[in-house]
């Protein structure tokens, strides 16, 4: 038996492949293939546009897939949300679907969009949002380069943004946030009802979320003389409590902990002054609480 899994092709592909690699899945694909090889005979991977994955999961063509909440909502896909995987092309944070207008536009509030023309890839989501605000507008599908359409072609856009830099570069300002979206592992309901496929998805969830949790974290090991243990532990942050192990035939101990990578630069000199020696920093692939 195999689990048929859809992964996003395009802007999220590289980050997704890196995540799977850290989770223990080595995906190999050439530029023309949509069927990556994977070092797990129980997985069949298909690459496709993130926009399409929820529909194919909903219809049962795929057992499960990775796509954003925005595209699940756009497709009105009736799927099981198995796991939140909060990552995007450049960061580990959600993206936002925003309404944006030109900096010098007279449009100041959402209600000012009444009767205006809006371009977006997420037509259904945008229409539902405007309807909830009591606004009737012309919402048209954008085939790309959405930011450059304001103000000559449309009055506003609804577009995904991670940092807002692309909007600012095109002299646009955010009028409102329609929703926040992040990648979700979602499953077809029949596949989720299958015990073998559900267990496979749950195992995959443990590994993928562990790999995400490990990003920006490192392990730190050091040797500490017995009379400096309290001093070192006093400055050492940890997820819970550091591991302290007695060294063989010695009054020294080995201390090991996991911490945020950003803390390490400033912490290592402090640990050294507190009495730690033989300090080793190492990367992590997965952190499973």
Curated annotation (Swiss-Prot):
Q: Which reaction does it catalyse?
A: 1-(5-phospho-beta-D-ribosyl)-ATP + diphosphate = 5-phospho-alpha-D-ribose 1-diphosphate + ATP
What is its EC class? transferase
Task: Write one Pfam family the protein is assigned to.
Answer: HisG_C
Q: Print the keywords alphabetically.
A: Amino-acid biosynthesis, ATP-binding, Cytoplasm, Glycosyltransferase, Histidine biosynthesis, Magnesium, Metal-binding, Nucleotide-binding, Transferase
Q: Which GO terms describe its cellular component?
A: cytoplasm
Q: Could you state a single Gene Ontology molecular function term?
A: magnesium ion binding
- The principal localisation class reads cytoplasm
CDD domains listed in its UniProt record = PBP2_HisGL3 (cd13593)
Disulfide bond in keyword set? no
The record's subcellular location field reads: Cytoplasm
Does the keyword field hold Aminoacyl-tRNA synthetase? no
Pathway involvement? Answer: Amino-acid biosynthesis; L-histidine biosynthesis; L-histidine from 5-phospho-alpha-D-ribose 1-diphosphate: step 1/9
According to the record, the protein's activity is controlled as follows: Feedback inhibited by histidine.
The protein's required cofactors: Mg(2+)
Q: Give the GO terms filed under biological process for this record.
A: L-histidine biosynthetic process
Signal sequence bounds: none
Recorded E.C. number(s)?
A: 2.4.2.17
In which domain of life is the source organism classified? Answer: Bacteria
Function recorded in the entry: Catalyzes the condensation of ATP and 5-phosphoribose 1-diphosphate to form N'-(5'-phosphoribosyl)-ATP (PR-ATP). Has a crucial role in the pathway because the rate of histidine biosynthesis seems to be controlled primarily by regulation of HisG enzymatic activity.
Q: Would you identify the family this protein belongs to, as annotated?
A: Belongs to the ATP phosphoribosyltransferase family. Long subfamily.
Q: What is this protein called?
A: ATP phosphoribosyltransferase
User: What organism is the protein native to?
Assistant: Desulforudis audaxviator (strain MP104C)
């Amino acid at each position: 038996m195999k689990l048929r899994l859809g992964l996003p092709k395009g802007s999220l592909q590289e980050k997704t492949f890196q995540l799977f690699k850290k989770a223990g899945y080595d995906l190999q694909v050439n530029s023309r293939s949509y069927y990556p090889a994977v070092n797990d005979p129980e997985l069949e991977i298909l690459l496709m546009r993130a926009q399409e994955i929820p529909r194919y999961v909903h219809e049962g063509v795929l057992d499960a897939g990775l796509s954003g909440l925005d595209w699940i909502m756009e497709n009105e896909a009736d799927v099981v949300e198995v796991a939140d995987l909060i990552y995007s092309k450049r960061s580990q944070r959600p993206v936002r679907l925003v309404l944006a207008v030109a900096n010098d536009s007279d449009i100041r509030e959402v209600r000012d969009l009444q009767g205006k023309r809006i371009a977006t890839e997420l037509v259904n989501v945008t229409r539902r949002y405007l309807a909830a605000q009591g606004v009737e507008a012309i919402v048209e599908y954008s085939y790309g380069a959405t930011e450059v359409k304001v103000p000559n072609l449309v009055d506003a856009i609804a577009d995904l943004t991670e940092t807002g830099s692309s909007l600012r570069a095109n002299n646009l300002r955010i009028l409102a946030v329609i929703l926040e979206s992040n990648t979700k592992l979602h499953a077809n309901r029949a596949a989720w009802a299958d015990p073998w496929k559900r267990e496979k998805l749950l195992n995959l969830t443990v590994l993928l979320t562990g790999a995400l949790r490990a990003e920006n974290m490192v392990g730190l090991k050091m040797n500490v003389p017995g009379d400096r243990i309290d001093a070192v532990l006093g400055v050492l942050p940890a997820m819970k409590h550091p591991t302290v192990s007695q060294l063989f035939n010695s009054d020294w101990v080995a201390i090991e902990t996991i911490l945020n990578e950003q803390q390490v630069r400033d912490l290592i000199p402090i640990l050294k002054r507190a009495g730690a020696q033989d300090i080793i920093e190492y990367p992590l692939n997965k952190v499973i609480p």
